[in-house]
Amino acid sequence: MAVTNYRYLFVDLLTNTIIAELPLTGVGFTQQLNQPGNFQGHLLISGINTAQFNVDASTIPGKCGLYVDRNGILVWGGVIWGRTYNSQSQELSLTAQEWMSYFAHRRVNEDTSFSNIDQLVIAKTLIENAQAQPYGDIGVGYNSHGQTTSGVLVDRVYYGYELKNVFEAVQDLSRQDDGFDFVIDVSYDLITGLPRKDFNTYYPRSGVAYTTTNINIPVFEFPAGNMVEYEYPEDGSLVANTMYTLGAGSNEG
């Protein structure tokens, strides 16, 4: 059975320079379209030389990011938003979210208007404008895999006084009728070999439409297959026997 090797590369948020590689345990992470996925992991401090591994400087929340390498391929990347040290267990716990979470902390702070502009171009411009702010550029590129136009032309006005966060602006745009999918993908640069991240947009949707004749469709097998376990939750707390509606009513008398 093939062995799966994971590496956890920690970088400076602004420069994307790798400043540490740490042996995390208890790692779990998710990837999502159109919103940031989550990451959590733990580092047993008692088992390593923290100064030699640059633990403190490489895990600063809001200042550092990390990439997850699986057998030489980057499969996750994002911003470290929290860390907690437990003195009893001597364990450092880290939480992070995918790179798109960074733009939930960036604001549209100037009046910005678009008239009859492709929705994918608007999304790209919002990301570019956020990174054009002082100390705002975290090196997110554009469309290494996705599409640059959709043919859907829209009007949008963002007022600076609203201070709308950039992630919400892009997400709202994607949720309209005839919208699109977006994600920040991670990969190794083919020239430098260093980690990179790209804002990709897909119209009408990311992925390949399912057909029974497509030999590349995913197949999940359980048990004794590629699925280890699954959960099937059921929740009766939202079941109702009677539905009620309330209207505006009128004044009595």
Question: Which residues does each PLM region occupy?
Answer:
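Acidic, small/polar-enriched beta strand-loop surface segments
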Residues: 2-9, 171, 175, 203-253
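Juxtamembrane "anchor/assembly" segments of surface/extracellular structural proteins
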Residues: 1-58, 90, 95-103, 121
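Surface-exposed cap/loop segments at beta↔alpha junctions
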Residues: 54-150
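Solvent-exposed coil/turn segments that connect beta secondary-structure elements
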Residues: 46, 83-85, 97-101, 204, ...
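Short, conserved phosphate-binding/catalytic loop or strand-edge motifs used
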Residues: 140-157, 190-197
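Internal metal/ion-chelating core segments
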Residues: 160-217, 222
